[in-house]
A protein has these predicted regions:
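Amphipathic, charge-rich alpha-helical segments that serve as recognition/docking helices
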Residues: 96-122
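Conserved kinase catalytic-core segment
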Residues: 114-164
């Protein structure tokens, strides 16, 4: 377990749609997330431990540590991005490309299958990436861990320059 005191100048402002939005910090090669409701950090830690026993490669998931941030429970992970890389959420990518709120666009579709296919097509057309395997792994893990907080601001791609 770690214990870290972090000043407000390390806070990373992230706009999101989630009710469970946690305060996030980036400091000394780590991302820190302070618990908002009490056990988010423990859940991240336990799921990352579980992932070590799956068939996924080490570069397909992030390992978390439990600890305290400014005296409050939370977790941290090593920064997995290189200096020239940026994490781009599906939400932000769609807004930048189309100028609309992707969550509102897909909310008007009748079935979950239509919503998923729409997002898959958009990513393929805008980035040239097939995300079927990625989504399959993420959504399978969500079902196993009973994650109810999957949304378009925590599904993302890594961008390096203009390439994904």
């Amino acid at each position: 377990m770690f214990s870290e005191n972090i000043g407000n100048d390390y806070i990373v402002i992230q706009e999101g749609t989630s009710e469970g939005t946690q305060v996030k910090y980036k400091k000394d090669g780590y991302w820190y997330k302070k618990d908002n409701r009490g056990n988010e950090g423990r859940a991240e830690y336990l799921v990352s431990k579980f992932m070590q026993f799956t068939t996924l490669q080490e570069n397909e998931f992030i390992s978390y540590e439990e600890g305290t941030i400014n005296g409050k429970s939370g977790c941290r992970s090593k920064n997995f991005l290189d200096e020239e890389e940026e994490l781009v959420t599906f939400y932000r990518l769609y807004y930048n490309e189309v100028g609309k709120d992707l969550s509102k666009v897909i909310a008007n579709m009748n079935t979950m299958e239509e919503r998923i296919e729409y997002v898959i097509r958009f990513i393929d057309q805008s980035c040239g990436l097939n995300i079927h395997a990625y989504l399959s792994k993420v959504l399978t893990l969500d079902m196993i861990c009973l994650n109810e907080d999957r949304h378009l601001n925590n599904l993302a791609l890594i961008m390096r320059g203009n390439d994904f």
